[in-house]
Amino acid sequence: MGPGARLALLALLALGGDPAAATGREDTFSALTSVARALAPERRLLGTLRRYLRGEEARLRDLTRFYDKVLSLHEDLKIPVVNPLLAFTVIKRLQSDWRNVVHSLEATENIRALKDGYEKVEQDLPAFEDLEGAARALMRLQDVYMLNVKGLARGVFQRVTGSSITDLYSPRQLFSLTADDCFQVGKVAYDTGDYYHAIPWLEEAVSLFRRAHGEWKTEDEASLEDALDYLAFACFQVGNVSCALSLSREFLVYSPDNKRMARNVLKYERLLAENGHQMAAETAIQRPNVPHLQTRDTYEGLCQTLGSQPTHYQIPSLYCSYETNSSPYLLLQPARKEVVHLRPLIALYHDFVSDEEAQKIRELAEPWLQRSVVASGEKQLQVEYRISKSAWLKDTVDPMLVTLDHRIAALTGLDIQPPYAEYLQVVNYGIGGHYEPHFDHATSPSSPLYRMKSGNRVATFMIYLSSVEAGGATAFIYGNFSVPVVKNAALFWWNLHRSGEGDGDTLHAGCPVLVGDKWVANKWIHEYGQEFRRPCSTNPED
């Protein structure tokens, strides 16, 4: 029985005070005047039933709207989930919206079947931690690419620099966020005390709820009152008491009986009266510092270039060539080499793999993908500064991988057979996927990299297995340059000097993927086995 039906029953019970009841219902038939008088309560019943039907019609219209919205996304199968806004809404819908829809309904027979169906697949749906991760990914993109929250809510990617706003990327199809979407992002930040991110997202949620005149949808978890409540306290926490007071007063317009909010209003009024304009002014909120990332400004600045490079005539020492490395393997089909930087020496080999090979590698790796880890002392940990999944492929998995190994060995001149090189690591980046500045080589003698007993990682060979629409560049922090994602190309650099010391200039990062599905394959080659292929040198510059 729905809420409307319960109201109808209450209305019927309320009819007990009618004067006609005093004569007893059992003798209504005995006089026509009593029959006529009985029509009056029926008219009231009709009114109650009409209100119930209208409520049910509104509820069904809302459910139909939700059904049509989700169905339209499934019917358009040509759209890959590469837009971070679309990806966030998919996770939120599966984790939160469906649960709210199903549990908002009453337990009729049909609804019971719907709930049973939901419970059967519930274990396969994203968890709340996934929703939190997707929300943090949007905040990461907001920070690194200086994105405007209002623009993101409309589905556009705009960069904010001072008072100017410029379009950073224009998607072919817009995916806007709802008020409840914005509220959920803001709440994730709010729950960790991150008011720098919470406030703009909650402000946008309030704005969108107001624009909808406070209309609540079945799948929504929050309402205008919720958004006002959270935003008011966030403003108070950063010292903007005037804003907190204004929002709290607005809250009381919609919920005048809320005693907690009434007490807050009195507190804010008292604080303003005692401190005057000192607490009324808006306070500048500092972005939370990232303690493990001391090179944040350089890293983000390089990511914001989206991998744009100077042309070769601007730096004549950079060049392109056909490379055989004196290998018979490459004699008939030399590699297309582009030197993108000299110190450290970074080479980009265009079309190193074919579309078919890149697709095959992705297909081989996909069933084995697991959350990527990083070396921390003697342990390997999952961390927030590396968001991706990875898999390791032995060359015995498919003959194509043996061919790929031969090609890498011919081009680098190095021995890449185990244990002198690691298995091929295939990485798929998630929503806003990134890997903040790091070295590929070990910087500690206790690093797990030494477990292979083949020395440190002397070189990195990284293959781009896909293209992206925006973001995802590889940024070299101390080299002060970045390389864009070039599908099927391979990036090569030396991690160690010939002396065996690590090259500090190879500190690099995978910039967050703004829009796209980024796949890379890494082949890490170790010191041992390369003694005569890359001889040692006492010159620290080599």
UniProtKB/Swiss-Prot annotation:
N-glycosylation plays no role in the catalytic activity. SUPFAM superfamilies: TPR-like. Transmembrane segments: none annotated. Residues 420-527 form the Fe2OG dioxygenase domain. 2-oxoglutarate binds at K518. InterPro entries: Oxoglu/Fe-dep_dioxygenase_dom, P4HA-like, Pro_4_hyd_alph, Pro_4_hyd_alph_FE2OG_OXY, Pro_4_hyd_alph_N, TPR-like_helical_dom_sf. It catalyses: L-prolyl-[collagen] + 2-oxoglutarate + O2 = trans-4-hydroxy-L-prolyl-[collagen] + succinate + CO2. Binds 1 Fe(2+) ion per subunit. It comes from the Eukaryota. Its EC number is 1.14.11.2. GO terms for cellular component: endoplasmic reticulum lumen. TPR repeats lie at residues 225-258. Glycans are attached at N240, N480. It is found in: Endoplasmic reticulum lumen. One of its GO terms (molecular function) is procollagen-proline 4-dioxygenase activity. PANTHER family: PROLYL 4-HYDROXYLASE ALPHA SUBUNIT (PTHR10869), PROLYL 4-HYDROXYLASE SUBUNIT ALPHA-3 (PTHR10869:SF223). This is Prolyl 4-hydroxylase subunit alpha-3. It comes from Mus musculus (Mouse). The lineage of its organism: Eukaryota, Metazoa, Chordata, Craniata, Vertebrata. The gene is P4ha3.
